Amino acid sequence: MNAPPTFESFLLYEGEKKIIKELDMKVPNAAIFTVNKEDHTLGNMIRNQLLKDPNVLFAGYKLPHPLEHKFVLRIQTTSEYSPHEAFMNAITDLLSELSLFEERFREAMKEKKEGGD
């Protein structure tokens, strides 16, 4: 089988960076972020969060190859807002939303156990 070992899908190699940022010179105020050891789950969540931001003109991601465990995220923003700021704000907002979701989920589970349903 040609599939790489399973651990390669989540362990960073020595010296490998989790996120690599490069400026996109083809369009103004754009950047390309390569996120290693992640897949559609995180890529789609970040893209959707970015699209909620009115200063983000474009946000899209792709997986270069099914056997490569990374996604490439392209972000273009308005001139007064950098792609890096948009990326960081999207991640911060996602963390807040997921924390709230976790809290509500735990409360619902607690109510379910106490209710005896």
Curated annotation (Swiss-Prot):
Which is a Gene Ontology cellular component entry for this protein? RNA polymerase II, core complex
- GO process annotations (BP): transcription by RNA polymerase II
- Statement: the UniProt record of this protein carries the keyword Transcription: yes
Q: Mention one GO molecular function.
A: DNA-directed RNA polymerase activity
- Alphabetic keyword roster: DNA-directed RNA polymerase, Nucleus, Transcription
Please indicate which superkingdom the organism of origin belongs to: Eukaryota
Question: Can the keyword Nucleus be found in this entry's annotation?
Answer: yes
Which cellular compartments is it found in? Nucleus
Q: How does it assemble?
A: Component of the RNA polymerase II (Pol II) complex consisting of 12 subunits.
Family membership noted in the UniProt record: Belongs to the archaeal Rpo11/eukaryotic RPB11/RPC19 RNA polymerase subunit family.
Q: What does this protein do?
A: DNA-dependent RNA polymerase catalyzes the transcription of DNA into RNA using the four ribonucleoside triphosphates as substrates. Component of RNA polymerase II which synthesizes mRNA precursors and many functional non-coding RNAs. Pol II is the central component of the basal RNA polymerase II transcription machinery. It is composed of mobile elements that move relative to each other. RPB11 is part of the core element with the central large cleft.
Stated name of the protein:
DNA-directed RNA polymerase II subunit RPB11
- UniProt lists the gene as Rpb11
